[in-house]
């Protein structure tokens, strides 16, 4: 692995802004309402098999870079908190976190002590892009909650969006577990009607977002993660949660493209997920700093750093004026 690129320089983007020319200060309501991804049905066998084939062809396990786990947790926590604030769909937050992970694997950022603002800026830009891909009502860039220590102007967020788009080669339509949820649920719940379908889908979505704090988008194929979260969400009793390889194979045995390789990958991810859940129950959750509203103005209020593209290459500690 090479030397880390200058994290500040990474956020200087020279792309044209013409493709992101919306009014950044206003909420946009799109006429092409986006539908949730878990609309796949049991009749879509060929469609799902094609998705799996694409995943298998494109999948590449990428090594972890040096971005600290605490920095990543803070970023994910902000994305999840902001999702709730705006009422975004679960898949919008998941896609934002996926953009975040993919970007960091392609452009490793070695943060210095006073450069944690770069992770927050990346979080804002990733969620904004995901909202533009998934949501019908898209907030303006100035409406995203800001940290009390610094403020990002819309132009800076838009330039970071362009950097993300360029880094990901403009491939923003990701295959996610949401494409598979209905399909797997139909396959594994044929003999279990004790848990409602809507409840299982909600459990799967909640479990998936919680799992993003432990597992990166780049570690597993998305159908593997979908199969595991659906298995756990559809369990009606604690005895259902400890499945063997053979029991998992039986759950998915009716799927034409399911092989021993798929079964092994799902089993290993399943075991890891159970270990994560057990560890959570044994260990108190760490305190993660989350974004709060700026304090009221007054003599005791902390001054906020303001970021715009005119002084973006300057050290954050020197940018004390609000422009």
From Swiss-Prot:
Q: Name one GO biological process term.
A: cell division
The lineage's top-level taxon is: Eukaryota
Which CDD domains does the annotation name? CYCLIN_AtCycD-like_rpt1, CYCLIN_AtCycD-like_rpt2
- Which InterPro entries has this protein been placed in? Cyclin, Cyclin-like_dom, Cyclin-like_sf, Cyclin_N
UniProt keywords (A-Z) are: Cell cycle, Cell division, Cyclin
| Cellular component GO terms, alphabetical | nucleus
Q: Where is this region: Disordered?
A: 17-36, 281-323
Q: Which family does the similarity line name?
A: Belongs to the cyclin family. Cyclin D subfamily.
Recorded protein name is Cyclin-D5-1
What organism is recorded for this protein?
Answer: Arabidopsis thaliana
